[in-house]
Amino acid sequence: MVEALVVGSTLVAMLASPFVRAASATDGRIRVLQETPVSPAADIPANVRKECTAMGDELPRAIMRSSRHVALVPSQHQLAEKTGRYLTVEITKVSAHNAGAFTGPKRMKVRGSLIENGKEIANFEAERGAMKAAGTCSTLEKTEKDLGADIGVWLENPKPRSRLGDQ
């Protein structure tokens, strides 16, 4: 009896999953990768790369908090489905002297593109700085929160070649 229930529910899930996936791509939400990648060409000090292992984690959450139209997805495959909208974002530069507290201001640059049905419809570059009496990684997390808020506002009225942040 239990095996029949398990097999039956598995079959229903398998049959329904293509429809659920298709609905998620067209429900009007903008897909954003749940971890922001660092560009392969990014200018980031080696000690910051090594120490700040969570760099890029806060930015997508901040975008989602700032825009009710955003849904986070775990994989590149789910991000770039053929229908609907998705936002690609990558970290392109981090300016941070040393990797400790009290080492001056930290800055982060990101760029992103809004894609709709496979075509870019808008893009941006954004930069923010922060200074606080804390370590480099937590200061950069604050810049991610600020950048996420900027990007969330931009998503309400996205335009090509936009400049965001405090640049």
What name fits each language-model region?
Residues 1-9:
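Bacterial N-terminal signal peptides that target proteins for export
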Residues 3, 35, 51, 58, ...:
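Glutamate identity and glutamate-enriched acidic tracts
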Residues 4, 13, 23, 80, ...:
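Sterically constrained small-residue positions within well-ordered secondary structures
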Residues 8-69, 91, 125-127, 158-167:
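A structural "domain/chain start" motif
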Residues 10, 20-21, 85, 106, ...:
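Generic hydrophobic/packing signal
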Residues 44-48, 117-161:
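Short secondary-structure boundary motifs at beta->alpha junctions and helix caps
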Residues 49-55, 106-111, 143:
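Short, low-complexity, polar/charged sequence segments that are solvent-exposed and flexible
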Residues 66, 70, 75-121, 127-134:
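Surface-exposed short loop/turn segments
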